[in-house]
Design a protein with these regions (language model features):
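General structural concept
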Residues: 62-63
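Hydrophobic alpha-helical segments that either span membranes
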Residues: 23-26
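Cytosolic nucleotide-binding catalytic cores of signal-transduction proteins
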Residues: 20
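Acidic metal-coordinating catalytic centers involved in nucleic-acid phosphodiester chemistry
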Residues: 1-17, 29-33, 69-348
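A short acidic/basic microdomain associated with nuclease active sites
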Residues: 31-58, 67
Length: 348
């Protein structure tokens, strides 16, 4: 009996392209909502180039441009998107990523060393790859020269065999693209300092990354954020097909307007205190940016809202914050006593 061979539904269903679209949509959502790009200095995302091969990029799935005040030249993240990958010396997908990255790294027309970064953006990868590659790249970024880097990685008690195996994988892949010659240690160290791996679970229908993104969208409007996410996806798909460049000016006006916060009147500090009904006083506005709980408040604001009586909600929050929920929430409860608190507690 003849029959077709079963294949991976993710591949036959064009899952790779769908994942790429979601990753690109993630960065556009960050741009629209005033978020920051990973691995770059904090500053507004001003444009995102999709399919940048036409402009000379080899790492071309998306190029994110970030600007900082009083600086004329933008910072760039060159991103290659792969739904899955293995970081080994023989993996063909990893070979393609390294070939493109090495070409861009040595092309001053598209990449500025000590300023721009290259990122392999992928779905969840194996624990071996995660631990090994993260350890390797962090050692590269926390050593001042190649000698210190090689010494630390080589010491058995200081570094794991897994990290050394990943170093071998990078060295062997770079040898192939360097005309069969091993890259000099100094250049290898520099390359690894500029290389990042970013993992997102956006291949899942309702993963943590998508939950955070929708929570961020909902900060601008209490309506259901899903239609807005879908609209951004649709626009990104169109730009991607045309190797376009996305800015706030090239997106539909109504989409950009959705992310504009309403104007709020500000009170001069001289009038920030006034008597209310005799002796009571309204206190000065709290500087939440420098408050001891600022980091926790930022995460809570990103999450949006959750139900403490719902175990599933608590589980998701715990996963996001990476800490015991009871410990994490304790400081936030204290902020509820402050007059201009940024949190509210219903039915409590």
């Amino acid at each position: 009996m003849d029959g077709k061979k079963l294949s991976n539904p993710f591949s036959t269903g064009n899952g790779g392209a769908a994942f790429e679209n979601k990753i690109q949509t993630l960065f556009v959502t960050l741009m629209l909502s005033g978020g920051y790009a990973p691995c770059l200095p904090q500053g507004p995302i001003v444009r995102i180039k999709l399919q940048g091969a036409v402009d000379g990029y080899k790492t071309d799935d998306l190029i994110v441009f970030v600007e900082k005040p009083n600086e004329n030249k933008p910072y760039k993240l060159l991103g290659q998107i792969k739904s899955s990958i293995k970081i080994t010396k023989n993996n063909q997908v990893f070979a393609e990523v390294i070939q493109a990255a090495w070409s861009d790294f040595n092309n001053s027309d598209v990449f500025t060393k000590e300023r721009d970064v290259i990122a392999l953006i992928t779905g969840p990868i194996s624990k071996t790859d995660t631990d090994g590659v993260d350890g390797l790249l962090e050692h590269a970024r926390h050593t001042c020269n190649c000698e210190e880097f090689i010494t630390k990685v080589s010491r058995a008690r200081f570094c794991s065999e897994n990290v050394r195996n990943k170093l071998t994988a990078f060295k062997e892949q770079l040898k192939v693209v360097n005309n069969g010659k091993y890259v000099e240690k100094e250049e290898l160290h520099k390359f690894l300092r500029h290389f990042h791996i970013l993992g997102y679970d956006l291949a899942k229908k309702e993963g943590v990354a998508l939950s955070l993104l929708k929570s961020r969208i909902s900060q601008f409007n209490n309506n259901n954020p899903h239609p807005i996410w879908c609209q951004i996806e649709h626009e990104v798909r169109s730009f991607n097909q045309n190797a376009g460049t996305i800015t706030l000016e090239t997106l539909p006006k109504e989409l950009v307007e959705y992310f504009k916060k309403s104007e709020t009147s500000r009170i001069s500090p001289d009038f920030a205190k006034e008597n209310v009904e005799g002796d009571s006083e309204v206190g000065l506005a709290t500087d939440w940016n420098h408050h001891p709980t600022a980091q926790k408040l930022a995460v809570a604001n990103l999450i949006g809202s959750w139900n403490e009586n719902n175990e599933a909600d608590i589980k998701v929050v715990t996963q996001i914050v990476g800490d015991d929920y009871t410990n994490w929430i304790a400081d936030l409860r204290e902020t509820l006593q402050i007059h201009d608190r940024p949190l509210s507690y219903k039915n409590g």
